């Protein structure tokens, strides 16, 4: 008799993890574990699966929306992949104070793209919020945005948004570590709003939408819209930003949660992917890896194209500074494009600050 050893190991581990999460949530539901209420309004954007849902572009969109209203938002993130500990001030709303190696690639990207927003990283979101209250006592932010905090129940929130990737068949997925689910799907009942991301508009969109509507929660639909292609001849040189020109032959590389979505977006813009290299989400690059990418691109006469998140990750790695001075590379800017429910989302975001 033969056994699938990985399945034998992973399935019980997933069951154990599921039970731990169930007990933890029950303790919060019964108020045995206490939830702290911030004096500042809180918006949480999270997911129920591990990475690749399109959460970060939505966080960026929400920050920009609040800024467009004349509000002062603060972003609180764990800062995945950083080499620091504790509460760290990434941006005071005027100056970005950290590189990505100290605050995480996604956090650095959010800080640089939203210079007027306060940005904090901390393992414990409550510590970050209390730091904001003390540090900015004379000029409090109008709203705090918790990045990736659906499972972080220590803080109460005024609006709880969960992002779900249409391309991932999560209704048939297993719990971590066998699968990618962070907690059972029944816990979507805690959310106030569901965002179905990376939609294609086909039968898959319709099927998942029907499943989500069974939760009784409002569902917003959003695809990924490609912005400009930002190209640098030498990663520290002035960037040249321009619309994507179809026909570019590329070597695409990325270390993100859902790399195939990146490839699909590039191909949707008419970029021809001749070769690609995928790395783990938040994986640090090495000079050897970058040199290999450049060599292959040069030999095949291809353009190196990556994600904006990977671009910021590379810029924050001290050991890459020498090779980046001469590396020609492009990154694609993206944003969510709402096909249904944008007005509802804005109404709910407005309600948070007008309470």
Curated annotation (Swiss-Prot):
EC number(s) for this protein?
Answer: 2.7.1.130
Keyword terms of this UniProt record: ATP-binding, Kinase, Lipid A biosynthesis, Lipid biosynthesis, Lipid metabolism, Nucleotide-binding, Transferase
InterPro entries for this protein: LpxK, P-loop_NTPase
Highest rank taxon of the organism: Bacteria
Q: Which reaction does it catalyse?
A: a lipid A disaccharide + ATP = a lipid IVA + ADP + H(+)
Q: Which GO cellular component terms, listed alphabetically, does the Swiss-Prot or TrEMBL entry include? A: plasma membrane
The UniProt record gives the binding positions of ATP as 49-56
Associated pathway: Glycolipid biosynthesis; lipid IV(A) biosynthesis; lipid IV(A) from (3R)-3-hydroxytetradecanoyl-[acyl-carrier-protein] and UDP-N-acetyl-alpha-D-glucosamine: step 6/6
Which Pfam families does the record match to this protein? LpxK
A GO molecular-function descriptor: tetraacyldisaccharide 4'-kinase activity
Q: List GO BP terms, alphabetically.
A: lipid A biosynthetic process; lipopolysaccharide core region biosynthetic process
Family, per the entry?
Belongs to the LpxK family.
Task: Give the matching NCBIfam families.
Answer: lpxK (TIGR00682)
Purpose: Transfers the gamma-phosphate of ATP to the 4'-position of a tetraacyldisaccharide 1-phosphate intermediate (termed DS-1-P) to form tetraacyldisaccharide 1,4'-bis-phosphate (lipid IVA).
Q: What is this protein called?
A: Tetraacyldisaccharide 4'-kinase
